Amino acid sequence: GRRGGVAEMRFAFRWDMSLPPQEFYKEANWDFVMCVAMILLYTRERWIEPMYLPKLPYSLLYHQTMSWLSSQGSVKPQELARYILTLGVFRHVSKEDYLLLLRHMLENGQIERGEDGALLVGDKGEAAVNNYEFLAVFSVPSEYSVRCNAEEIGTVQTPFPEKAQFALAGQAWEVTELDLKERRIFVKHIPGISANMWQDTGNEYVHTKVMKKIQEVLRSDEEYAFLDEAAKKRLNDIRRACRNAALSTSSVISERIADSAPGFPGGKVVQITPTLYTVFPFLGTRACMALMYELRQRGFGANVWLHRYIPVCIEVKTDRSLAELETALSEIKLHGADKYTFRIPDNCEISGKYNDYIPRELLRKQYVEDYLDAEDMQRNL
């Protein structure tokens, strides 16, 4: 705002209305709805999404270990652990896990053991520490070439795994092969538009309170004063589409729509095809991921469908009946889930600048601990 005037902030959203018809949830611009929800949370409840502090920041642990060794020259293992593990950010890291990391670093030449038993930066570690980018904790984005046959379509900064779908150059693509060494992603064209599949960097979290407010916005008929006429119309269109699918009302039941099962008050199960259902639990990222894995544990082919980084729903591909899916959701609500028993794919990890120097066992442990929240899932399902 000008001096003496009222400050004003405007949010603009672009949506291509000429896209071909798709499932109702793929036609909604959820970032717009989430923006409405977050404005309401702040203006009416004075609530903003809290920062999530990871419990097991192993990439940062590597960085601080190398920084300390570089500054000290050589340090006894006990002294190193005593200093590093007393830093507040590492209070959840066990001595056993730190010992595992140090052994891995020794095996890979990042650090070496001196004649007196002290640890010092190794030959390979010197290359990392002396690089000017080492001063930055965060990674410098890498570009991956996206190719369809022999033609380069463009570049992305995310190494999408095989079968992942994403949008680029105005079209949708599915990954057929990933070459990390050459930084190439081979794809095939698919119809429609795509949002990234459930595998992502693990760094973008949406809070469950935000998702519940999104559900509230969809259920409401209120016209918000901060929306202009075009935005009001767009929100009403999205509300109407969701209600037609029985997503946001509890009284609509048809042959294609399943109302909430007993003990499952969170959202709706919508049958898209005879073998495809969508579950709308309105859970935050970490809770929604936990629900996806628990459904997989129970034999359902589940994937979180993301709009950008917003966990809109879980797509369930199965030959099993709607009643079986509803029963499973009711049981999950009643009994919860043990995230430490989930079968996590080997390529799943929370992105970190120094993940290449971290044992796979620790990266998996970090993913389970910091990217899955079974308690929040059960509490808010």
Region locations from a protein language model:
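Amphipathic alpha-helical transducer elements in NTP-driven molecular machines
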Residues: R3-V6, N29-V36, S59-Y62, P77, ...
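Short, conserved charged micro-motifs
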Residues: R286-M292, D319-A328
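Conserved segment of the helicase C-terminal RecA-like domain
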Residues: G1-L53
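Short amphipathic alpha-helix segments
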Residues: T249-S260, F280-A302
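Terminal, basic amphipathic appendages of nucleotide-handling enzymes
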Residues: G4-E8, A12, V129, P141, ...
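A generic structural motif
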Residues: R10-A12, L119, R183-K188, Y277-F280, G301-A323, D338-I344
